[in-house]
Structure formats: structure tokens, C-alpha cells
Regions:
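HotDog/MaoC-like acyl-thioester-processing domains
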Residues: 1-15, 95, 99-104, 108-165
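Hot-dog-fold acyl-thioester-processing enzymes
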Residues: 2-89, 154-165
Length: 165
């Protein structure tokens, strides 16, 4: 899937205080181990027994794995059908509870601020808070950061000369 060449969601479609809930991904032991082998090979992400001996009490997903899952859920929910231009970064990220095999994750996004980019007025900035919730509605991760979105194009004149006197 790629970003839409004619997106339906632009900067103007984000409203201050708006809350969106999206995603439902059930984490498997196999994907926890696969991600950990590639990107975060700490024992408690690779082996159930090592996980049980850790403060997590079982095989736990890497926090970076959880972040990658959030990114995918954001893409599926709205980014791929938007005028997204990327992100200048996150202001904070906190891992609050371990994500274990069998957990089903979803995301609650709250729009905290919207404003045009001062140096590039055709781009709008959106600051959001994301809370990642498991199937028990426990918050396992919080993030806050900015997204950049293209602004909605001005409507084209219907015919040459329209609006002239």
C-alpha cells in the first residue's frame, strides 16, 4: 500500500481536541522473537524462560516493536489516505507496561494542536498524543509528537475568467 496520489485527508481535517481510536493487532510470540532477533536481541525478548526470569515475568515485546506496530496502525487508519509529509519528531515516548504474546493493541489519538508551518504555509503541523491500549484497556505506551500534512488545495476556478469583473 502507498500514500494516495489524491488524498482525502489534509491538515484542515484535524480538529483541536479530536479523539480517534483505531487499530486492533494481536501480538504473537513468533513476531516478538522475529523482531527481537533482527532489532533488539535482549534475552527477555527472545526466550520465554529468560522472560519469566526477568521483571516482565514472560516473553515481552520490545518497546521498539510496539512503536513499529503503532506506526503500521496509523498508516492503515489515516496516514496512507492523507497528505502526510512525515514528522519532525516525537517529544516523548514512555513504555508503561510490557506487551506480551496474546495482547491485542489499539491506539487512541488526541489532537493537541494544529497550526500552519511559519516557514512553509502550504504545510500544516499537527501535534498529537497517542495512547496504546491493550485488550484490558490498560495503557502500555504513550507518545507525543508532531506530524506534517499538506494543506487542502484552493478550489480551481470553474472557467477561465470566472470572478473577474
Amino acid at each position: 500500500m502507498t500514500i494516495s496520489s489524491s488524498p482525502t485527508h489534509h491538515w484542515e481535517d484535524f480538529s483541536l481536541g479530536e479523539v480517534r481510536e483505531f487499530g486492533a493487532h494481536t501480538v504473537t510470540a513468533e513476531e516478538i522473537v522475529r523482531f527481537a532477533r533482527e532489532f533488539d536481541p535482549q534475552p527477555f525478548h527472545l526466550d520465554e524462560e529468560a522472560g519469566r526470569a526477568s521483571l516482565f515475568g514472560g516473553l515481552a515485546a520490545s518497546g521498539w516493536h510496539t512503536c513499529a506496530l503503532v506506526m503500521r496502525m496509523m498508516c492503515d487508519a489515516y496516514l496512507l489516505d492523507s497528505s502526510s509529509l512525515g514528522s519532525p519528531g516525537l517529544e516523548h515516548i514512555k513504555w508503561l507496561k510490557p506487551v506480551m504474546a496474546g495482547d491485542t493493541l489499539g491506539v487512541r489519538m488526541t489532537v493537541l494542536e494544529t497550526r500552519p508551518m511559519a516557514s512553509k504555509p502550504h504545510i500544516g503541523l499537527v501535534r498529537c498524543a497517542w495512547a496504546v491500549l491493550n485488550q484490558r484497556r490498560e495503557t502500555v505506551l504513550t507518545m507525543e509528537g508532531w506530524g506534517m500534512f499538506g494543506r487542502r488545495p484552493a478550489p480551481a476556478l470553474a472557467a477561465a475568467g470566472e470572478g473577474q469583473s
